[in-house]
Regions:
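N-terminal juxtamembrane segment and adjoining first transmembrane helix
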Residues: 19-35, 167-175
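Alpha-helical transmembrane segments
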Residues: 299-311, 345-346, 373-378
Length: 378
């Protein structure tokens, strides 16, 4: 294990970052995860095209059992979730946390080992899912042995990240660090529930647990990881400090305490208790709090008088700029005079989404993961 000595840092956009120098951050783990994630994204994208073709030509590849819809669809879902999104999130966490802590990654060897195990997991998922070995639960299709490997890899990832944070140079933690720590803890809870607790029950109880997992896989795994990426790269790319760190923390704790309880909305008017439906309706209104907080952050951040140069700088980074514009549009937190601008931005976002053959939400999520490539040279 390489010595984890503190490195000299400076502030870029109010975010501590290492001063350029030889071998400050090796980023070997980062490259392994991000390259793998991009590769899986392209491969699974081809799987998605095959599935889409089956809706037009139902007999397309229908004589080959490995390419039937019932096997291809779980491969596409799990490939995008674990191969692309979660793999990219882990790679970006390995990039962001050491820089926010002012130290090197606690163990580059452990990180590389985690990456190797993660690739073994993805390849095992391809073989088992195409072979018809699956549990038949949404987002939890992976056979139990493969799911156990996911747990082991996540423990390795969590140990490395938390050990890096424990040796940090700065006492106060930036909001991205909070979101990434939350992602690690929430993922452990959510994944164990969806992949193991569901096997201990049947019927309505199993369905309720499964949709709790499915719902929170989006809200407590990919959402906080995406927010961590945005809170890090947007201020850094624009070289402008975050508008209000306390506001971002309000969004963090709102997500932590509210989102987990609303998973049953997938079963509204279904065979679940009425009190559960009533309570989740009450809590669901607060799910918007993190988004509104983030949107207000970006709006205030973007409207500062000193931000004209930073806006031009952001405009030169397409994916960061689209992330800012998308957050404005989706949060609905823009001031009334900016409605005309928001409409133009919405049209731009919609045209980009149509060009990519998907919806704006997924486009935003993918752009957030690609931002590292465009902002690394800023």
């Amino acid at each position: 294990m390489a010595p984890n000595t503190a490195v000299e840092v400076q502030s870029v956009g109010g975010i501590p970052t290492a001063v350029a120098g030889p071998d400050v951050h090796r980023d070997i783990t980062v490259k392994w995860f991000l390259l793998g994630a991009v590769g899986y994204f392209l491969i699974v994208g081809i799987v998605a095209l095959i599935i889409a073709a089956k809706f037009v030509w139902p007999d397309f590849l229908g004589s080959i059992q490995y390419f039937t819809y019932g096997r291809m669809r779980p491969l596409h879902v799990n490939g995008m979730l674990f191969g692309w999104l979660l793999g990219a999130d882990m790679g970006l966490a390995y990039y962001i946390v050491p820089r926010l802590c002012g130290v090197r990654l606690w163990s580059e060897k452990l990180g590389v080992a985690t990456s190797i195990l993660w690739n073994i997991i993805i390849l095992s998922a391809v073989v088992t899912l195409l072979g018809g070995y699956q549990k038949g639960l949404e987002y939890a299709d992976l056979p139990t042995p493969v799911a156990i490997l996911v747990v082991i890899a996540w423990v390795m990832f969590g140990v490395n990240i938390f050990a890096t944070i424990a040796t940090r140079k700065y006492k106060q933690m930036y909001v991205s660090t909070w979101y990434l720590m939350g992602t690690i803890l929430w993922t452990a809870f959510v994944y164990l529930t969806g992949n193991f607790a569901t096997l201990l029950t049947t019927g309505v109880n199993q369905a309720n647990l499964n949709w709790m997992y499915t719902h929170n896989a989006v809200g407590l795994i990919f959402t906080p990881a995406g927010l961590a990426v945005g809170y890090y790269f947007i201020p850094r790319a624009s070289n402008t400090p975050l508008y209000n760190h306390k506001l971002s923390m309000i969004g963090f704790w709102s997500l932590a305490f509210v989102y987990v309880w609303t998973g049953a909305h997938h079963m509204l008017h279904g065979p679940i208790s009425q009190w559960l439906q009533t309570n989740l309706d009450r809590l669901f209104g607060h799910v918007a709090d993190p988004g509104l907080g983030g949107g207000l952050q970006l709006h205030r951040h973007h409207e500062r008088p000193v931000a004209s140069v930073q806006r031009q700088r952001l405009a030169q980074v397409p994916d960061v700029g689209n992330g800012v514009l998308s957050a404005h549009v989706l949060s609905g937190s823009d001031a009334q005079p900016a409605l005309g601008e928001r409409d133009r931005l919405q049209d731009r976002l919609d045209s980009r989404a149509r060009a990519h053959g998907g919806d704006g939400h997924l486009l935003i999520h993918c752009h957030g993961r690609r931002v590292l490539c465009d902002s690394a040279n800023l």
